[in-house]
Amino acid sequence: MARTHKLEDVRNIGIAAHIDAGKTTTTERILFYTGVEHKIGEVHDGAATMDWMEQEQERGITITSAATTCEWLGKQINIIDTPGHVDFTIEVERSMRVLDGAVSVFCAVGGVQPQSETVWRQRNRYGVPSLVFVNKMDRTGADFLEVERQIRDRLKGNPLVIQLPIGAEENFEGVVDLVKMKEIVWDADAEMGSAYHEQDIRPELQEQAEAFREKLIEGISEVDGNEELMEKYMEGEELTTEEIMAGIKAATIHMHVVPMLPGTAFKNKGVQTLLDAVVHYLPSPVEAPPIKGTKMEDEDVEVVVESTDDGEFASLAFKIMTDPFVGQLTFIRVYRGSLESGSYVLNSTKEKKERVGRIMKMHAIKREEISEIYAGEIGAVVGLKNTTTGDTLCSDKDKVVLERMDFPDPVISVAVEPKTKADQEKMGIALSKLAAEDPSFRVNTDEESGQTIISGMGELHLEILVDRMKREFKVEAEVGAPQVAYRETIRKAVNKEYKYAKQSGGRGQYGHVFLKIEPQEPGFGYEFVDAVKGGVVPKEFIQPVNKGVQEAMARGIQAGYPVEDVKVTLYDGSYHDVDSSEMAFKLAGSMGFRDGCREANPVILEPMMKVEVEVPEEFMGDVIGDVAKRRGQVSGMDDRAGNKIVNAFVPLSEMFGYSTDLRSMTQGRATYAMEFDHYEEVPQNVAKEIIEKRNS
């Protein structure tokens, strides 16, 4: 099967936005106008084609980036739909990695919202050229130029207005195209916004249009590489439409400007002009910067993988999904060469061979089977066994590893218990499949309680995963409250004598020990020293004492949490020829240790998290006050891209519910990350609560 479109006629784009900016509706309209979709799905009634998992339809938010292919002006456009909720940032990171360009959707009323800041940071990190689509121009309070100001001030972006809105709110009827200097007006009586026409700019808009066109030309002629434009412009010569378009494209691809256009997807205006801009200004795989990687055999040797059809196959797996009909789908972006179904490839990240079964081109939820996939394309492969997100698949003739993505560590854990025995087995399978799909989700077993602990990026993240276990894998599970792993230790050294003696007719029990118990540095662990002189405790009874001490350590002193950082020395004792046994000395060791520790100023330790909050300056005071309320200590402050960074150490037990609290405290404009740092002593009043709770 030959290529349907030349490599330079392909566009791989993502549509990224804040939750509720209207991203899914925009994608739906794109599919409708490009002729793939016949009845438009609205998110409001939960029927959008792109939102193909049940939970997304219920919550009205997009969770998994479905990949879809469509065509406009003879170009193939592959769209990756990205989620807009903070807990799903991993999905956005993932799709940013494989895109060549992006459309950022902003709400004309809400403007720049917190998630837009996060998505914008990721876009800059991965260097993805973008357009801005200001959606919902028909809504009360819509203000296109206010959104432009916010992008400049809040996101430190460089928006380039290429179209102005004609009217706003219910009077929004079209756009002024500043490149052609024409109005584009949608016909009021045409069905679904399918007809629109060009006309001359009305007199009352002429002056504004000329001022913005001036700004547009200035904006693109200041860019390196566009010097000829600058000269013509300075000499007052008229620039041709082609020159302006080439200038916008060059400035966009080099990340100097972000072209901006208005519209309303819901009311079917401005989507066709957005598609035109995608084709004209966003890069094809050939124009996008080539992807870098390393040699599989030697990761110090860097290689550049140019986008081309000839050359050995190289691709990146960016998403794994479980499909009810075909099993596991691995979404790949091909960077070089081509791949045929039925062939073998090398997973160079894991150094394993894989056999490719079928290859699918996805259209949101419908799929088309193809026999071959080429450079620059995005498709789903069936049949891979060992490939996970971020792995490289390549030919074994040129073994490259494309750069891996960075995945954040989970920040919240809960225990899950299967409701029945039957659920137990299914739960294990379900959790391992979900973990393969989502690298920011971890599963482990708590050695102390034997419970299954799941960890993820936020409370909503875990809620949705438990919900998917129920729906897709039919596993019923009880979810516990988030848990903290405390520890215990002592603060002063003591000497303790303990005699275990039992006499009840026949053979008795006798073990007698003198222990020195000493606190040690954090992280020391445990040490047992045998300092017995003159055989007062026979050799064979020494290890049982050690074993008894360790069993007592595991049981804890005050609240039943494991004891750590102690040194125990056995320095004296006595024994009885008949009544002494290993058991007697083990019990003497464990009871002696327990009683000794109770006199050694025992304390409870809690995990301290290193927390970093990125917050706009106006909310910094609230965030710092809140850290203090959570028993945290601020360790430093910093600046980053117009925001403040607050670094602090906060007890894990005080961080539950933090993402929700932080969101409401900062109108959702702050983001945070946390990781475990060290254990620290719990204050007296908190320790008292922990002990009472454990012993009740």
Curated annotation (Swiss-Prot):
Database matches in Pfam families: EF-G_D2 (PF22042), EFG_C (PF00679), EFG_III (PF14492), EFG_IV (PF03764), GTP_EFTU (PF00009)
PROSITE patterns in UniProt: G_TR_1 (PS00301), G_TR_2 (PS51722)
Residues forming coiled coils: none
SMART domains assigned to the protein according to its UniProt record, in alphabetical order: EFG_C, EFG_IV
Keyword Phosphoprotein among record annotations: no
Entry-linked CDD domains: EF-G (cd01886), EFG_III (cd16262), EFG_mtEFG1_IV (cd01434), EFG_mtEFG_C (cd03713), EFG_mtEFG_II (cd04088)
InterPro entries for the chain: EF-G-like_DII, EFG_II, EFG_III, EFG_III/V, EFG_IV, EFG_V, EFG_V-like, G_TR_CS
GO molecular function: GTP binding; GTPase activity; translation elongation factor activity
Localization, UniProt: Cytoplasm
GO CC terms, sorted: cytoplasm
Keywords: Cytoplasm, Elongation factor, GTP-binding, Nucleotide-binding, Protein biosynthesis
Residue ranges occupied by any tr-type G domain in the UniProt entry: 8-286
Main location per the UniProt record: cytoplasm
Binding site for GTP: 17-24, 81-85, 135-138
Any one GO biological process: ribosome disassembly
Physiological role: Catalyzes the GTP-dependent ribosomal translocation step during translation elongation. During this step, the ribosome changes from the pre-translocational (PRE) to the post-translocational (POST) state as the newly formed A-site-bound peptidyl-tRNA and P-site-bound deacylated tRNA move to the P and E sites, respectively. Catalyzes the coordinated movement of the two tRNA molecules, the mRNA and conformational changes in the ribosome.
Family in the record: Belongs to the TRAFAC class translation factor GTPase superfamily. Classic translation factor GTPase family. EF-G/EF-2 subfamily.
Name this polypeptide is given: Elongation factor G
Origin species: Sulfurovum sp. (strain NBC37-1)
Gene coding for it: fusA
